[in-house]
């Protein structure tokens, strides 16, 4: 996603990785030159040992991002790969962290955690209906823009989530200047490639390309 959104040069940027887990996204940020990464996760002891001991990484375990009001320095870029919580809960919090005049967010949109319970239950936790995918993307991106972000880009994630769930990546700018055409972003996705989750999710590789 960093390459897709032209975020390949992160020199001097201070970043936050929400849902750091083993550190795949953190590693990706470091490889692209991030000055510092705050690795935030509700879990404990999961972060890869090498990443944990990198002097550019600030490990923040047992921390729920929704309750973090500020960091001790302005944040330039936030990446989000969170489960069991909606981006509509996180985005209003994240905007408080961002460094004016231009903060950026790369967020993984997971329909299985954004759709209603009835839609999720029908597929035993797997969202197969492309119309639900579209509705979720519309809800999240329109919400983000109401919160002052601009939806700068949207792609389908090259990796599926648990149980083969199809997921998406959004690039948001805060504060946004001109609202994006959300429908155009959504319809620009490769829907003809199919959105039926039939295969089990693949484990995310070290230094996952996001």
List the model feature ranges, each with a label.
Residues 10-21:
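Conserved class I S-adenosyl-L-methionine
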């Amino acid at each position: 996603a960093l390459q897709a959104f032209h975020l390949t040069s992160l020199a001097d940027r201070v970043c936050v990785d929400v849902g750091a887990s083993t550190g795949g996204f953190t590693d990706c940020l470091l490889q692209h030159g991030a000055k510092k990464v705050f690795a935030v996760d509700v879990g404990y002891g999961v972060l890869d040992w090498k990443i944990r001991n990198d002097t550019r990484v600030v490990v923040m375990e047992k921390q729920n991002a929704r309750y973090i009001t500020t960091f001790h320095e302005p944040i330039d870029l936030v990446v989000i790969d969170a489960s069991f919580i909606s981006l509509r809960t996180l985005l209003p919090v994240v905007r408080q962290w961002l460094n004016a005049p231009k903060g950026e967010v790369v967020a993984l949109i997971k329909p299985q955690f954004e759709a209603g319970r009835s839609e999720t239950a029908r597929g035993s936790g797997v969202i197969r209906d492309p119309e639900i995918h579209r509705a979720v993307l519309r809800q999240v991106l329109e919400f983000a823009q109401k919160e002052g972000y601009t939806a700068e880009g949207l792609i389908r994630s090259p990796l599926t989530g648990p149980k083969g769930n199809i997921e998406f990546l959004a690039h948001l700018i805060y504060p946004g200047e001109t609202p994006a055409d959300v429908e155009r972003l959504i319809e620009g996705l490769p829907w003809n490639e199919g959105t039926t989750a039939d295969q089990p999710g693949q484990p995310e590789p070290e230094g996952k390309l996001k």
